[in-house]
Amino acid sequence: MSIPQIRTEAIEAVGRKILMEYDPSLLSGQPCPVPIETIIETKFDLILEFHTLRKNPKILGETIFDDGAVVLYDQIQRQYRMIAVRAGTILIDERLCDPSKLGRLRFTCAHELAHWVLHKKLYSGTGDVAAYNGNVSSDESHGIIERQADTLASTLLMPLPQIKKCFYRLRIGRTDEQLIVEMANIFEVSKQAMQIRLKSRNLI
């Protein structure tokens, strides 16, 4: 099975459809943080769990596509352990629950949901990209699917109609940096995520 080549505008359309079905006001009302955790658990009926995924926080999230088991790090015992997991579980590293990492937490949740929406048929087993079975190299497949997941995550957390509405309301008298900070606070995303979103739409 090959990786689908999905145009950016097609991914934007997927994101709009998800938000429209959940709550149309997220696209047309007062700009606000998208309740991504609630969308994951109620609209998609997925299980959201928080654990220490690895000793070093290099992997912040994993999406489980089949019933099975995963290896997680136990900070108390200081060793890895195996736990049973069900298909439709999203695992998030609990160290992201620090209030200072709110933007990173929300983006990671959206990113993992994006894998479920876009890549469910591409995965087998309970791993992350390593479990992918395809006809391209693992490095190439990893890059493609991660970019696609990032794009959908951005679309979900920073809907384009709302981003444009905010941008044109706030831009007068503000530097790009000030604009990025204010808009990141409104949507509860990181400054980096907001900067990338605005640049990708040629707004800054």
Predicted features by range, described:
Residues 1-204:
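Active-site hotspot residues in diverse enzymes, especially metal/ion-binding acidic/histidine motifs
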